[in-house]
Amino acid sequence: VQMRNVDPFLEFFGIPQGYSRGGEYVPREFKAGGSGVIISQDGYIVTNHHVVDNATELKVKLYDGRTFQAKVVGTDPTTEVALIKIEGENLPTLAFGDSDALRLGEWVLAIGSPFDLQSTITAGIVSAKSRNLGAIPNQYRVESFIQTDAAVNPGNSGGALVNTRGELVGINTLIKSQTGTYMGYSFAIPSAIV
């Protein structure tokens, strides 16, 4: 998932983001990336709220190279889940698994596009369940993260966490890091919440 957006930092501080030759204000746009999971053959995709929040344009690129315009169907900032839609038929989907049945030490795979490296898969184990980190900036947040040591980096947000049967057990959402990149602590929203 790629989005185009106005720079919220500059907007917050009232810093001009760009002007046309005639002096008319033109917001500066930037591109960002994330991942998503197709959950229906007609194009519904689950991703993270922060991947699509404030986006002015969404494009979805599939692993086979096809590109689609997408629209936001809905977001839930309390769970950090978003649903978007592309127009397509017979799209490949991922079946839901039972995140409640995951056991500590069980192998899982994180799938996504970290640093715009499409269709990247990393492996790790379930390190903990039901983590409440206070990471979702909403007083009504619902947090119960799956912790894993599968590598998750910027661009993985919204991507799939699957069990060894290839079933969706979580949506990769965040990392705990002092550098902003993977340091061994990755967190996913359980499929039971999605």
Predicted feature descriptions by range:
Residues 1-194:
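Serine-dependent protease modules
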